[in-house]
Amino acid sequence: VAAIYPITPSSPMAEVADDWAAHDRKNLFGQTVRIAEMQSEAGAAGAVHGSLKAGALTTTFTASQGLLLMIPNMYKIAGELLPCVFHVSARALAYHALSIFGDHSDVMACRQTGFAMLASNSVQEAEDMALVAHVATLKSSVPFLHFFDGFRTSHEIQKIDEIAYEDMAKLLPAEKVAEFRARALNPD
């Protein structure tokens, strides 16, 4: 599941995930990702929390003020040791005027939530570290905040060496995925 609320500069990530879902592109598990577009960033974080509690591997994409609205749910997710990754296109917060400059003030506001943090510096690193974050969260049950420069990296057009699903599968801790799903809340 990907719970989204498009916010610039993270919108392209959500748009790509939505496009893949619309075209029935399968993920590593042979499933189409379910996209839940919410009414706000806080709603997206709440949907991530609920989806994780139900046993679905879940992620979201956000930036700036949107990330700040997710902080209350980030505490819950970390406190309940739910494995997930928030992909953050980091940019300046609008303190008194709108700013689109890249900085890490949004990410640094989340240091105390219990999320581990992992940074990327290029488009290639963003793909590589996204995989590292997803594997690490499954192995540790510590949620991850994977961040990179907003606009510079999030909107850069660059050829990358994609990681094949076969290679990803070798890194995936299948037993940890099964343990996570077994802990899910189930009305039965």
Specify the residue positions occupied by each region the protein language model found.
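Conformationally flexible catalytic loops at phosphate/diphosphate-handling active centers
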Residues: 29-33, 144-188
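Intrinsic-disorder/low-complexity, polar/charged segments
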Residues: 29, 40, 122-123, 188
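Conserved thiamine diphosphate
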Residues: 100-150, 162, 174-177
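Thiamine diphosphate
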Residues: 1-109, 114, 131-132, 150-151
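Glutamate identity and glutamate-enriched acidic tracts
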Residues: 15, 37, 41, 80, ...
